[in-house]
Each structure stands twice: as C-alpha cells, then as structure tokens.
From Swiss-Prot:
This is Superoxide dismutase [Cu-Zn]. It is found in: Cytoplasm. Signal peptide: none annotated. Belongs to the Cu-Zn superoxide dismutase family. Keywords: Antioxidant, Copper, Cytoplasm, Disulfide bond, Metal-binding, Oxidoreductase, Zinc. The keyword Metal-binding applies. It comes from the Eukaryota. GO terms for biological process: cell redox homeostasis; copper ion transport; fungal-type cell wall organization; intracellular copper ion homeostasis; intracellular zinc ion homeostasis; negative regulation of cellular respiration; positive regulation of transcription by RNA polymerase II; protein stabilization. InterPro entries: SOD-like_Cu/Zn_dom_sf (IPR036423), SOD_Cu/Zn_/chaperone (IPR024134), SOD_Cu/Zn_BS (IPR018152), SOD_Cu_Zn_dom (IPR001424). GO terms for cellular component: cytosol; mitochondrial intermembrane space; nucleus; superoxide dismutase complex. The lineage of its organism: Eukaryota, Fungi, Dikarya, Ascomycota, Pezizomycotina. Destroys radicals which are normally produced within the cells and which are toxic to biological systems.
Length: 154
C-alpha cells in the first residue's frame, strides 16, 4: 500500500487535505478530500497539475497532468487528462468532503502523481463540454485559490 497526502493552502481562505491510497500499480487509487473555505453550495474544479512547484503560488504548478496527451474531460470520460478529477461540491458552509476511486490516477509506476500538485479552482470545471478551445485544456475552471504538493505519507 502506498499512501500520499497534499495539504492545500493558498491566497484565499480555501484549504484542507487530499489523501491518496493505492494497493498496487494495477489497482485504482482512492482519493479522499476534506476541503474548507469555498463558496457555499458551489462546484469547484479539482485537478492534479504537472509540477510540484509552488514558488510562484499555484500558477507554478503548470497545466493539468496529462502524460497520455488527451483532451480535458470528466473523470468518467475515456478522453481525459490523468489529472482531471472533476468538481468538488460544497455544502451550505462551503466545505467539501468525499472520496472516489480513480483508475487513471497512480501513485505507483511511471505516471505517478507523487510530487505533483493538487489544485482547487475558483470556478466550476465544464468537464471539456464548453464550446471553446480552453474547455478542452482546462475546463474553464478559472483561478487557483489553493493548492498543495502530493507527498508520500506513512
């Protein structure tokens, strides 16, 4: 079992943790989040970005992690970036808690997400369904108020 965690911080009040667990390279990765400080009753883009570099805030994390050269999509789409986790849905206090199993996100193997950055966006991810070029790159999810590098944990 490999475990990793990202502690999210940023310019705004958004923060929290994202935990990753994977049994073997062929197994799905369980992703569990506990995020606070978002707008109430909102959907916010949730992605893994390429670089574990936050020297210039969350913008240094680069584009979505996309080792297979696919277009942006929903987590259930075959055509999606590895880093496309969709949207977090917040409650009436702006908090989001949840868990999902993802077949594309890996902690083990050549396309591991360890050392990359989890980003919470300020807008809703259109899941690649917007009718413009940016939708197929970013989902039009907007600015990056919080992020954290994915590190190995015990």
């Amino acid at each position: 079992m490999v475990k990793a965690v990202a502690v999210l911080r940023g310019d705004a009040k958004v923060g929290g943790t994202v935990v990753f667990e994977q049994e073997s390279e062929s197994a799905p990765t369980t992703i569990t989040w506990d995020i606070t400080g978002n707008d109430a009753n909102a959907k916010r883009g949730f992605h893994i970005h390429t670089f574990g570099d936050n020297t210039n805030g969350c913008t240094s994390a680069g584009p979505h992690f996309n080792p297979h050269g696919k277009t942006h999509g929903a987590p259930t789409d075959e055509a999606r970036h590895v880093g496309d986790l969709g949207n977090l849905e917040t409650d009436g206090q702006g908090n989001a808690k949840g868990s999902v199993k993802d077949e594309h996100v890996k902690l083990i193997g050549p396309h591991s997400v360890i050392g990359r950055t989890v980003v919470i966006h300020a807008g809703t991810d259109d899941l690649g369904k917007g009718d413009n070029e940016e939708s197929l790159k970013t989902g039009n999810a907007g600015p990056r108020p919080a992020c954290g590098v994915i590190g190995i944990s015990s």
